[in-house]
Structures are given as C-alpha cells and as structure tokens.
Amino acid sequence: MLVMSISYLHSIQDVSFVYETGDRPVLVLCSDMQQYICKYMRPNSTIAYKLACELIGAQMADAWNLNTPPVAIVNIKPNHWNNSVSHSIGAPAIGFRKMENVLDVASTTYKQVTPNKDTLYQLLKIALFDFWIANEDRTCNNANLLYNVETEQIISIDYGGVLNNVLFDNPLSQLTETDSILCADIFAHICKAVSPKTLFQNVQLLEKDYYKCIGRGKKQKAVLQTMPKEWSLSADKVALKIDELFATQWIEETWQNFVECLMSNSNYGK
C-alpha cells in the first residue's frame, strides 16, 4: 500500500463560515471545487503539533481503512481570510472535506445509527484505533463521529487529540476506560441489538485485522515528508513519537486495554 496521497489546494473564495469551537476552524471553497473545514496556524507554541496530530491521525485512519474525510493541505489566500480570525500569515492550513448528507452523532441523534453487525464492527474498529493512537478527544461525551444514514457508514473525524493531546515530550500512555467511545450511548445502542456470538465473532475478526492495520500504518510513516515547513516542527521529535506507535509492547498493551474496556461495557467474555 502506498502512502496516502495528500492534495495541495488553495482557496478560491472568501472564508464562508467560522465554527465557534475551540480551534475556530473555517469553511472555505478550494481549487478542487470542494468545501474544506480548515484548521490553521495561530500565534501559539503548541498549535503546530496539533496540526501535525491532525495529519498523522488522518493518514493513520486511512491506513486502517476507517471511513474518514479526505484531507488536504490548504493555502488560504490572504485576501480570503475573515478579519475576525487570528492566524499566522503564510502558513498552510490542514483541511478536511466537508461531508454531505451526514448527521453529527450526539446524545440526541445516536439512535438514528442502524444497529447491526456492520455498524458494530465499524465502531469497534474506531475504538481500537483510538486506543492505539492514544486519541484523548473522542469520549462518551464527544463522539467526533458522523453518520451517513443511507450508506450506514460511521465516519471518524477530528484528530487533534491523538498522541495524548500533543504531549510530544512524554512517552505515550494508554487511554483510561472513560476516554473510549465504548462507554458512549451509541455503543450500548448498537451492542444490545446484536447477539453475544456476533460480538465475539466481530472481536475475533478485529484482532486479525488489527495487525494488518499496524502493518499498513508503518508505511504511512512518510507522513513527515508531507508536513509543511512553515509549521516549523521538530522532525526528530515527531518521528520518535510516531515510532512509539509501532513498539511491540505498545501494540500488545493496546489490544489488552481495548479488550478490558470492552468487557466492562458489554457482555463480551461473559
């Protein structure tokens, strides 16, 4: 498998919307005629590593064959910025294509997700991915998931909290049980609709797939070559952090942690 192809795009219109969330991402129409939700450099010492996490997370999610929006490096032209948005001039943004015909999975919408063995497998795989990549931003209170009702695809979004929320100066640490989507209502909703046998079979399949995902992920380590130089990242620091994901002990502990969390939140193993 080749390294995920990254598109390099530029804005062709003014920023059309500013999302009033923590990172204040912006929506912009790009040169491929698609709209992208973009996160960008700001006068902040840690934001570059957060952008790196977004890119690493997106590429690893692709290696895992998760449903995730296409990603691009976006040059938002100076005259297209909204004056109310503080940003670093000249530094490219990271953009995720805006998905159409999807709903945001939340406490008021999760029951619209069709509960069956396929959506169960998708959610289990996303949960395992989060354990492996130490994604602290997807929790029972913040799913960071979209859902396409027509195709029954669960779509993973937002990777700024991977690698333990940008703590690049410390070793990776395993997520706690409450950090997992397995503790969320959507998992209980899907899990109670399938048999214990189906759950067991899905976990067996996932364990086999896990090691294949790790193998494909190793080929994505060239992600470093795609990071804009304007982000002024320490390539050595990022490389060491990515290497931690592929340590044998980390891979084994991740699976064990995932299974323990699964047992606490389902009838698996009972």
Task: Mark where each language-model region is.
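Conserved ATP-binding subdomain of kinase catalytic cores across diverse folds
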Residues: 2-102, 132-136
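Glycine-rich loops and low-complexity Gly/Arg-rich segments
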Residues: 62-66, 94, 119-123, 170-172, ...
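A general structural signal for short secondary-structure boundary/capping elements
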Residues: 72-75, 138-145, 193-194, 202-207
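Ordered, amphipathic secondary-structure segments that act as subunit-interaction surfaces
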Residues: 95, 100-109, 121-123
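Conserved kinase catalytic-core segment
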Residues: 110-168
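C-terminal catalytic region of ATP-dependent kinase domains
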Residues: 154-270
